[in-house]
């Protein structure tokens, strides 16, 4: 079959741009909604533990926040990867095809170059660490202080502590602050 004259590299690249930006938009919505789901899970577990007077129920909180936090982090990383791909690969290729150096998508770089970007990224990292690090850690501390103990619950709590620490470390590592 002969290639169609209607299909050009530029059209293919623009179609790819549209697709990756749509994926990025979808992932942003999903990631942001994960915070609401995490807050709902926290309230549910804390309310249930308080109502039932069973501190062991607090052990559900680190599990829930770790699962939701890893999902949040994975989506956040993909969102950043899409932006980086558009800035460093797709945009410049389209610019070259158009006879202009650089990327035709100015916003992809412009919003990353303001003077308060580093401050915002640090604040966002702290905000991310609260639901996915501080709150589950507080639940574990409350369990250790007020729980009945026992080998298996304490063992589970220590495994959860390791998972929460690993997630918190990854949140800090992935907190991209470079322009």
Q: Where are the regions a protein language model picked out?
A:
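Hydrophobic alpha-helical transmembrane segments
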Residues: 51-62, 147-162
């Amino acid at each position: 079959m002969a290639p169609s004259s209607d299909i050009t590299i530029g059209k293919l690249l623009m179609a790819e741009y549209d697709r990756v930006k749509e994926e990025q938009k979808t992932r942003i919505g999903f990631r942001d909604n994960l915070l609401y789901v995490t807050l709902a899970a926290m309230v549910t577990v804390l309310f249930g533990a308080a109502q039932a007077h069973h501190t062991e129920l607090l052990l559900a909180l680190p599990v829930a926040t770790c699962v939701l936090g890893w999902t949040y982090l994975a989506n956040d990383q993909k969102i950043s990867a899409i932006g980086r791909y558009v800035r460093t690969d797709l945009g410049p290729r389209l610019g070259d095809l158009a006879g202009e150096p650089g990327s035709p998508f100015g916003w992809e770089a412009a919003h990353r170059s303001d003077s308060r970007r580093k401050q915002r990224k640090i604040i966002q990292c702290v905000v991310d660490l609260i639901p996915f690090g501080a709150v589950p850690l507080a639940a574990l501390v409350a369990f250790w202080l007020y729980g009945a103990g026992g080998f298996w619950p304490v063992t589970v709590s220590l495994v959860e502590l390791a998972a929460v620490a690993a997630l918190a470390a990854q949140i800090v590592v992935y907190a991209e602050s470079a322009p």
